From Swiss-Prot:
The keyword Ubl conjugation does not apply. This is Large ribosomal subunit protein uL22c. PROSITE patterns: RIBOSOMAL_L22 (PS00464). It comes from Morus indica (Mulberry). It holds the Pfam family Ribosomal_L22.
Length: 140
């Protein structure tokens, strides 16, 4: 499987959790609440929401922030969640033994969660550098 990323590598950092053992519908219920919010506000929301999906998403947001801090030297106070998506994963199928030699199927859905964090200060500097370049260098 080839994963293509069309993110700006200078202003965005992402983290992916695959094969999380819950349905994508239940994870989307939580992801929709945090999309577009700041990092600090997201942590508060995830700690106070009463859903089972909050814990793996909270771990993923922590991981994305650690990636941003360690790899790109971003400040956690300036991070926002620019993209958050949930996709369906494989369905784990089992058979539960029943009476008279029968077997009932058990379907356990999984999902893949992607969190993309963006640093607002770095993005402004990045866009300003292009504005300078367009204004002075590419002018004929």
């Amino acid at each position: 499987m080839i994963k293509k990323r069309r993110t700006n590598r200078y202003t965005e950092v992402y983290a992916i959790a695959q094969y999380i053992s819950m349905s994508a519908h239940k994870a989307r219920r939580v992801i929709d609440q945090i999309r577009g919010r700041s990092y600090a506000e997201t942590l508060i929301i995830l700690e106070l929401m009463p859903y089972r999906a909050c814990y793996p998403i909270l771990k993923l947001v922590y991981s994305a922030a650690a990636n941003a801090n360690h790899n790109m030297r971003f400040n956690e106070a300036n991070l926002i969640i620019s993209k958050a998506e949930v996709n369906e994963g494989n369905t784990v199928k089992k058979l539960k033994p029943r009476a008279r030699g029968r077997g009932y199927p058990i379907k356990r859905p999984t999902c893949h969660i992607t969190i993309v964090l963006k640093d607002l200060d770095v993005e402004e500097e990045y866009l300003d550098s292009f504005a300078f370049e367009d204004k002075y260098i590419h002018k004929k």
